[in-house]
Amino acid sequence: EQYHEEKSPYSFQRKGCYYTDTLSREGKGALVKSGVGLTWSGFRPSDDACIYGYLIPSNMFATVVLGYMETIAHEVLKDEALAAEAASLKKEIHDAIESMAIVDNYYYGKVYAYEVDGYGQYMLMDDANVPSLLAMDYLGYEADDRQVVENTRNFVLSCANPYYYEGSCAKGVGSQHTKPGYIWHIALAIQGLTSKTKEEKLAILNTMKNTCLLYTSPSPRD
């Protein structure tokens, strides 16, 4: 959805629940600016409601999948019209990400926001669930500036990210979906898969080994 406000019939409301389990404005979600090139999401991969409806990791993933679609349409289906449509939409979303989702962080410089609304508001965070900002290299997103990618990774794996936690036994990214202070194995796996150093990969493997079980969210303090 690139015109959620004007054209979408979608809404979602749930009664008697926590605020992250339903959408505001009678189920439409927070207001976003239409026609900016980004695609709308009501909920994050964690199943929590988006604060701002343009979820950047999902838009990044969309550009990757549209690239696959372009290749399949061209090489397998021999459908040049479909290939051109996929390529055009991929470029539109990619350009919107690069122009609207890069913001300045006091500690890390230019980084990708997790969510934006198209009006200038944004959310600086990352969640353990994929697609995530931490997973952009794993998913295959092609950023215009690698320094922004590295800055974003450094931000995500720091206490500047409100869902990053450190304890005496482990450290990593957690989620709004579980209790504060708990890290997720899925984020540790993505961190390891995208790491460029053997030392970091080994440290993550040791962290996973020491928890004894691969479950959703261990405490880094136990």
Give the predicted meaning of each segment.
Residues 60-78, 134-145, 187-199, 222:
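Well-ordered alpha-helical scaffold segments within catalytic/enzyme domains
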Residues 1, 221-222:
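Intrinsically disordered, compositionally biased terminal peptides
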Residues 2-63, 76, 83-183:
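Extended ligand-binding clefts on enzyme/binding-domain cores
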